[in-house]
Amino acid sequence: MKGQRDRGTEGGSTGPALGPLNPRSLDPSPVLQATDIWRVFETGAERLEILRGVDLEVQRGQLVAILGPSGTGKSTLLHVLGALDRPTKGRVVLDSLDVFSYPESKLHELRNRKVGFVFQFHHLLSEFTVLENVAMPLLVAGMARTEALGRAHEVLEEIGFVSRLTHRPAELSGGEQARAAMARALVNEPAVILADEPTGNLDSTSAAALVDLMVRLSSERKMTILVVTHNQAVADRATRRLHLAEGKLSEEANH
């Protein structure tokens, strides 16, 4: 029964087999390349260099943990990679698209098609059900409601979370909200998912379940996920661990 499957996956480390690979997941080219990224803020005579010549290349199917002290620019880097913020200097290529060659008016469409976002505060819309929240990126992109809801249902089924379809966010636990947010990030089959402290407000059981889901998505679906985190469990299970300090990005040794 579906309800039984939900209970097993929401609290544990195993779940149903995820859906078929997106054909582009077999493409050997990097899904994300950032070259000489600078983000500088100037206020009067003060110049604050948040990112200083960051270079990054990410292959499809990698789960990349971005670590570092608070206030070192990890979220800023994620925002630049996801085209939420323009770099002062540098280039980002996402799924073969030169992101910042597009005018501002086109960046929203690019983000909606190519990037799935998951944040510490999951920003589910309180007036809509779980199913409607997950379908929202498709509805915003103009997909017919019936088709969008159908696709959202498929994604929720894939991750083993169909027992709360008609519930609203206020009726969900923190872990359930996190799973709904991850499903919403997946619904467009994005090129990359960018997650900013997604386990930050979760208890240990819910955090472990979300980490397990991210690992399964990268290994079984070849989904590319970059996650800013202070959670050691995420770092321990990531494909790669990057460290950001003083505006510079370095890679930790394989573990």
Q: What are these model-predicted stretches?
A:
Residues 241-253:
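H-loop (His-switch) and adjacent beta-strand-loop-beta switch element
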Residues 1-5, 10-40, 250-255:
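ABC-family P-loop ATPase nucleotide-binding domain
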Residues 30-244:
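ABC family nucleotide-binding domain
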